[in-house]
Amino acid sequence: MREAEILLWIYVWFYIDWGINYYRESFFTRAGISPAKYDEQRFKDFLYSYTDSLNRYCCDIDTVSAEQVQEEIKLSYKKVSDVYGLTTPRSFQHPKILLFNSLYSGCGVLGFMGPFFSESHINMQITPLEYPFTYAHELSHLLGISSEAEANLWAYQTCLLSSDAEIKYSGYFGLFPYVLMNARGLLNEEDYKNWISSVRPEVINQYKEKREHWSSLYSPLLGEIQSAMYEFYLKGNRISSGQKNYAEVIGLLLSLPDEGIKKLAEN
């Protein structure tokens, strides 16, 4: 009975401290919009507008100042309208160092938000190019966002709102895997080849280097265990699509009105 009582209090602690965010209104309700039905031309318009910006901001990022990135991203979050229901980032909120970093790398985890103490964590082996987008993603969870798709949307938007060109590029690059996934699934073979050929070779090379970096650290056994547990966790907390929710950020972007897409994709 004692063990059951402890588990019950852990359960209560989780939902009181942060887990209650899984029961808040959806992004669509807070934004006052409806989920968009797939429209091929609208998707292509977004795709090529996004790609133009991705190519324009493409650059090499060899080092990154964590403090500068955190300051810039927090400034961007302070520009977000109150209607979306995010809390205001505080100066004392900084990502914590992982004690067993290699285990998280082995699972392919770049960062996470610890719900019990409301702390964000960033993998110390993350590449400089990925740091701004990942930090912005994890900070959104700390500010009350439970959906992974919406966390990606805010990571994308807040990076684009930065005055720093490298942070902007991290935003575009961070969205690239989800754009790529959607393009592969929605476009016919000819259209897909035409689109992917429009992406700068430097971007493709950086994407390959990123994948190789994490593949070299990945443990199939740890990855499979973590993936199964995380899938169970997400589906048990009203994220019915599980880990596929990450890629649903594109659907959120396409559901925004035209001026919203322009602001998010062409800033």
Region roles according to the model:
Residues 37, 62-66, 121-125, 138-143, ...:
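Second-shell loop/turn segments in exported
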Residues 156-188:
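Short helix/loop segments within enzyme catalytic domains
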Residues 203-267:
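Pan-zinc metallopeptidase signature
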Residues 40-63:
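Short extracytoplasmic
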Residues 20-44:
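Alpha-helical transmembrane signal-anchor/signal-peptide segments
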